[in-house]
Swiss-Prot record:
HAMAP family reported for this sequence: ArgB
Enzyme type, top EC level: transferase
PANTHER family reported for this sequence: N-ACETYLGLUTAMATE SYNTHASE, N-ACETYLGLUTAMATE SYNTHASE, MITOCHONDRIAL
Subcellular location(s) of the protein: Cytoplasm
Species of provenance: Salmonella paratyphi B (strain ATCC BAA-1250 / SPB7)
Enzyme Commission number(s) of this protein: 2.7.2.8
GO biological process annotation, one example: arginine biosynthetic process via ornithine
Family recorded in the similarity comment: Belongs to the acetylglutamate kinase family. ArgB subfamily.
Catalytic reaction list: N-acetyl-L-glutamate + ATP = N-acetyl-L-glutamyl 5-phosphate + ADP
Pfam families membership: AA_kinase (PF00696)
InterPro entries attached to this UniProt entry: AceGlu_kinase-like_sf (IPR036393), AcgluKinase_fam (IPR004662), ArgB (IPR037528), Asp/Glu/Uridylate_kinase (IPR001048), NAGK-NC (IPR041731)
Residues that, per the record, bind substrate: 43-44, 65, 157
Protein name as it appears in the record: Acetylglutamate kinase
Chief place of localization: cytoplasm
Length: 257
């Protein structure tokens, strides 16, 4: 069975209750299903907290964090360090054998600089599946941060949705984007069960989908096109529904290519 990538986002890393629910769902799923799982995570809330403590400005452009050269070390420490190891600690607590990685390990995801204006922000492209497939074959849960490295050794901060998309293409995996929201909402705050590219463009033009959600929707659309299969956007808040989601039952918004 092809692997499933679960991309974690939002304030999940700040909530012990959410992490407990998520890892309980992961344990239950792994006990009853053989499907290999991979976690990809960002950690914007961890970065924001650290930047605030250091009195450093947080600047975003089109939903992407501007990352100057003097901040990439701090952001790497927050994402590949604190956020990644927090998730590994929760996996350990729940007796799940896990391995912490970043995108550059085993050249799993290739990264180039997105553009000069954003600084150390990377564009993710599919890489080599060898390392992660080896870990999956041996029963490990890879936990991958959204920090990458260019061919000339420059660390890059990669949007975690886009990192997960590139890794899904690398592994031929299905993809779920878990966030704070239960899916994409229409103008009345109602969840949209299915979303096509034309519907997404319409809602962006109307100002209903904005900021970071535009990046999330575009990443999901890119993933659906690249993978040739639907991608789910859903919430981690409903833990009891997560095993069904991991098994292919939509509970949020299903993005169609």
């Amino acid at each position: 069975m092809n692997p499933l990538i679960i991309k974690l986002g939002g304030v999940l890393l700040d909530s012990e209750e959410a992490l407990e629910r998520l890892f309980t769902a992961l344990v239950n799923y792994r006990e009853s299903h053989q499907r290999p799982l991979v976690i990809v995570h960002g950690g914007g809330c961890v970065v924001d907290e650290l930047m605030k403590g250091l009195n450093l400005p947080v600047k975003k452009k089109d939903g992407l964090r501007v990352t100057p050269a003097d901040q990439i070390g701090i952001i790497t420490g927050a994402l590949a360090g604190t956020a990644n190891k927090t998730l590994l600690a929760w996996a350990k607590k729940h007796h799940i054998a896990s391995v912490g990685l970043f995108l550059g390990d085993g050249d799993s995801v290739n990264v180039t600089q997105l553009n000069e204006a954003l600084g150390h922000v990377g564009l993710a492209q599919p890489g080599s599946p060898k390392l992660i497939n080896m870990l999956l074959e041996n029963g490990f849960l890879p936990v991958v941060s959204s920090i990458g490295v260019t061919d000339d050794g420059q660390l890059m901060n990669v949007n975690a949705d886009q990192a997960a998309t590139a890794l899904a293409a690398t592994l031929g995996a299905d993809l779920i984007l878990l966030s704070d929201v239960s899916g994409i909402l229409d103008g009345k705050g109602q969840r949209i069960a299915e979303m096509t590219a034309s519907k997404a463009e319409q809602l962006i033009d109307q100002g209903i989908i904005t900021d970071g959600m535009i990046v999330k929707v575009n990443a999901a659309l890119d993933a659906a096109r690249a993978l040739g299969r639907p991608v789910d956007i859903a919430s981690w808040r409903h833990a009891e529904q997560l095993p069904a989601l991991f098994n292919g039952t939509p509970i949020g918004t299903r993005i169609l290519a």
